Amino acid sequence: MARTKAAASSQLGLELTQTVAVVQRLCGVDEAGRGPLAGPVYAAAVVLNPARQIRGLADSKILSAEKREALFDRICDHALGWHIASASVEEIDSINILHASMLAMQRAVQGLAASGVIPDLVQVDGNRCPQVAFPVEAIVKGDAKVRAISAASILAKVARDRELLKLHQEYPEYGFDSHFGYPTPQHFTALEQFGATPHHRRSFAPVRKVLERGMVRTMSSEAPPF
């Protein structure tokens, strides 16, 4: 999932390391969905266009769903390039959530580069960096400090939320439309009552405990008629 725009980009005016004098294309990267018990982990890579400013960029966690949706469309329309990627539940269970998050971010940067937008510098939210073929650095709380990372956090969050809303259509009794897979009391109650779906992360302790009792949901058609 990507879109690019061919345009010359000068210094972006974002937070940069002091060792970088001029960055023509700064790529912000962030992920969404490390903590949930269900669903993929998503990541996005964004290179903003300094000639097309986007007002209201901020850490996706402090924005309302409506604001995120509006900004999602503006980012996709205004950015020089962007790419959204994910790592599946199966990959999360196979290599653990940290490495799956790194994989999703790596895929996002690779997808951006494959579309023709080659970053000079990649800045990643957090304290760890994925392996990419470009200069990369981690920025703690980068989603609140660097506009390109804020934009990436919004794309990743909205894309993941949309995926969980699709799961809600298949499994309405789990309440994915309200908790989006995160470990809330409502989600724990649904797991205890209905068991784990194929979309739950089996390596996560609350899900593993349910599975150990043989509580498995395999088909969405088994949902209660309400």
Curated annotation (Swiss-Prot):
Q: What is its EC number?
A: 3.1.26.4
**GO cellular component term of the entry, any:** ribonuclease H2 complex
> What catalytic activity does the UniProt entry give for this protein?
Endonucleolytic cleavage to 5'-phosphomonoester
Question: Where is this protein found?
Answer: Cytoplasm
GO function term, MF aspect, one: manganese ion binding
Does this entry carry the keyword Nucleus?
Answer: no
Top-level taxon in the UniProt lineage? Bacteria
What is the purpose of this protein? Endonuclease that specifically degrades the RNA of RNA-DNA hybrids.
Write down what this protein is called: Ribonuclease HII
State the species of origin: Cupriavidus metallidurans (strain ATCC 43123 / DSM 2839 / NBRC 102507 / CH34) (Ralstonia metallidurans)
Q: Write the gene name.
A: rnhB
